[in-house]
């Protein structure tokens, strides 16, 4: 079987080329061709020796997921549906803003964590994505938008906030982020790569040492009682442990704060008393808040908090001194908004079957 070079960080690719009898600078050349010029044809890598190109043809490939569908929203958001084989598809989303362009990248086919308000979670779980399948999303987005080294950068930020829990696919996600950060890869700064986690505490501690990027935490609740219900991983790593891990992470993080994400669910976690409880909860953690209006999907069982409830919640946090934003709902007309990504998952957990047995809908998130 041929080796997919997209799976390699620069050190790993350098080692691979050394085993082929090639000098280290060849690895840098190939990295730039793959990631900066979006090239997956060895014959087009014209500054490589013909003998090396022949070796690569025989032993290697640059294989990205197959593009199945590209959609553009009326607000400029773009979504790509990528086939990763055996009936599984994942989604990645580009969100343009005045001062930046953010790509939301998936890390798994489905998700095993079963957050109750998330469409991806309802689809069940199949497998982790490979490093090539993760970085291939960035590769495709650049390719689709016509990005070249001579163009102005379009994707300025990457957020690991798509399908899946990134820290549950630790090795492949870290390798992909290292490629994003590498000057011979995508050249992003650590401040511009954000990993979002539901709170896998041991992996957060590993990430602090291995590849500290900006951190976002899917908090969504002001106490363990509510969080146990809507983010079940909280039963294993309760809020006290999660917040302590956030404090430890900030010792080496590129930013001096954690972003807490908080989906606003009507009558569940959106009351003024919840906001005040939240202020008390995070008092020892330098942080910002990102309030996320819930994006309904069929038979989700939840409603979106009212605009008045969101404003009142935001004001309580702001008055306590916390920078608080309310996320704009982007790409809703193409199901690209937060919590709507579902792709196509050949579920190994039977979660979808169990959900249907309870009277759910096969339309959830699709």
UniProtKB/Swiss-Prot annotation:
Localization, per the record, is:
Cytoplasm
Note the HAMAP family from the entry.
Answer: RNA_methyltr_RlmN
Q: Which InterPro entries does the entry link to?
A: Aldolase_TIM, Methyltransferase_A, RlmN_N, RNA_MTrfase_RlmN, rRNA_lsu_MTrfase_RlmN/Cfr, rSAM
| Enzyme Commission number(s) of this protein | 2.1.1.192
Among its keywords, does the record have S-adenosyl-L-methionine? Answer: yes
What cofactor requirement does the entry state? [4Fe-4S] cluster
In which domain of life is the source organism classified? Bacteria
Q: Which residues form the signal peptide?
A: none
Q: Which SUPFAM superfamilies match?
A: Radical SAM enzymes
Q: Where does S-adenosyl-L-methionine bind?
A: 164-165, 196, 218-220, 295
Radical SAM core domain location is: 97-333
Sum up the protein's function in the record's words: Specifically methylates position 2 of adenine 2503 in 23S rRNA and position 2 of adenine 37 in tRNAs. m2A2503 modification seems to play a crucial role in the proofreading step occurring at the peptidyl transferase center and thus would serve to optimize ribosomal fidelity.
Q: Name one GO molecular function term.
A: tRNA binding
Species of origin reads Laribacter hongkongensis (strain HLHK9)
Q: What is this protein called?
A: Dual-specificity RNA methyltransferase RlmN
Q: Which residues form the active site?
A: 91 (proton acceptor), 338 (s-methylcysteine intermediate)
Extract one GO cellular component term from the record.
Answer: cytoplasm
Q: List the disulfide bonds.
A: 104-338
Q: Tell me, which GO biological process terms does this entry list? A: rRNA base methylation; tRNA methylation
Q: What is its main location?
A: cytoplasm
What reaction does this enzyme carry out catalytically? adenosine(2503) in 23S rRNA + 2 reduced [2Fe-2S]-[ferredoxin] + 2 S-adenosyl-L-methionine = 2-methyladenosine(2503) in 23S rRNA + 5'-deoxyadenosine + L-methionine + 2 oxidized [2Fe-2S]-[ferredoxin] + S-adenosyl-L-homocysteine; adenosine(37) in tRNA + 2 reduced [2Fe-2S]-[ferredoxin] + 2 S-adenosyl-L-methionine = 2-methyladenosine(37) in tRNA + 5'-deoxyadenosine + L-methionine + 2 oxidized [2Fe-2S]-[ferredoxin] + S-adenosyl-L-homocysteine
Binding of [4Fe-4S] cluster, residues: 111, 115, 118
What family is this protein classified in? Belongs to the radical SAM superfamily. RlmN family.
Task: Provide the top EC class.
Answer: transferase
Question: Other remarks on record?
Answer: Reaction proceeds by a ping-pong mechanism involving intermediate methylation of a conserved cysteine residue.
């Amino acid at each position: 079987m041929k080796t997919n070079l997209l799976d390699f960080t620069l050190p790993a690719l350098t080692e691979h080329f050394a085993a082929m009898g090639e000098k280290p600078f060849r690895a840098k050349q190939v990295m730039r061709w793959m990631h900066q010029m979006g090239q997956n044809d060895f014959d087009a890598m014209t500054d490589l020796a013909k003998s090396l190109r022949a070796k690569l043809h025989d032993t290697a490939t640059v294989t990205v997921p197959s593009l199945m569908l590209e959609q553009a929203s009326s607000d400029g958001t773009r979504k790509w549906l990528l086939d990763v084989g055996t009936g599984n598809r994942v989604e990645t989303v580009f969100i343009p803003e005045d001062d930046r362009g953010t790509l939301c990248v998936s890390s798994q086919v489905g998700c095993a964590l079963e957050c109750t308000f998330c469409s991806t979670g309802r689809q069940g779980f199949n497998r982790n994505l490979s490093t090539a399948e993760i970085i291939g999303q960035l590769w495709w987005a650049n390719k689709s938008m016509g990005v070249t080294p001579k163009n102005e950068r379009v994707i300025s930020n990457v957020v690991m906030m798509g399908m899946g829990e990134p820290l549950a696919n630790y090795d492949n996600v870290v390798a992909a982020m290292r490629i994003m950060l590498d000057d011979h890869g995508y050249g992003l700064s650590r401040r511009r790569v954000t990993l979002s986690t539901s709170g896998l505490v041991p992996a957060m501690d590993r990430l602090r040492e291995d590849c500290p990027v900006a951190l976002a935490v899917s908090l969504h609740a002001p106490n363990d009682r509510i969080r146990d219900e809507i983010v079940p991983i909280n039963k294993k790593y309760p809020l006290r442990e999660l917040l302590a891990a956030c404090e430890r992470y900030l010792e080496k993080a590129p930013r001096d704060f954690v972003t807490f994400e908080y989906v606003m669910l009507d009558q569940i976690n959106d009351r003024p008393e919840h906001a005040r409880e939240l202020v008390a909860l995070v008092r020892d953690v330098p942080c910002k808040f990102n309030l996320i209006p819930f994006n309904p999907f069929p038979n989700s069982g939840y409603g979106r908090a009212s605009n008045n409830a969101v404003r009142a919640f935001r004001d309580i946090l702001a008055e306590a001194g916390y920078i608080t934003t309310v996320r704009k709902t982007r790409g809703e007309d193409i199901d690209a908004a937060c919590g709507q990504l579902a792709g196509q998952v050949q579920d190994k957990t039977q979660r979808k079957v169990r959900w249907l047995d309870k009277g759910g809908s096969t339309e959830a998130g699709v």
